Amino acid sequence: DIYEGTWDEEEIRGKGKLTDKKGNVYIGDFIDQKFSGEKGTLSLINGDIYTGKFINGQAEGLGEYIYKKGDKYIGNFSNNKREGHGIYIWASGDKFEGEFEKSFMKSGKFMYYNGDICEGNYKNEKLDGLGTFDYKNGDKYVGNFLLGKKEGKGIFTFSNGDIYEGNYRNDFKDNGKFIFSNGDIYIGNYKDNKIEGLGEYTYKN
């Protein structure tokens, strides 16, 4: 390792620059020979760069992490992991703002680059449990999700005024009530998102 900076009784302490054997470079404050301070910068050999607070050699507290691939995270860290409130921006333009746990999205709002917005709880980086999905075209879904797919009870409101209220299975309508904007009502089964099987259709007239 190569260190340039201040010393205290033969220990690295104060401001300095440390380049380790792998080529990672840290510039900032040191306490007891470890990265510690309100603002330091760690440039990793893989191209990633972290700037923020360090405690005992780890990212802890507010910071910004820029990935070589173009993604960026701004928010709280704990033990080198994304923890608590933060904003993650993908190189694609997608953006998530909310709570993180052990670097994974836990709850919050996901804004897609195409204008779609979803909000709720997450599991394995996918919507899970109660949530909402607002589509750019004006459609909206409010209901249950299972690993990113509509599953269980939910209400889908179409931009043209149609409303579906019922059950979903694997992201598709399964059984429920469809209220058409013209006043017609269908109650029954579906297959591949289309009316099929047992059901009752009531015409407004």
Name each model feature, range by range.
Residues 1-205:
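Glycine/tyrosine- and acidic-biased, solvent-exposed loop/turn segments at the edges of beta-strands
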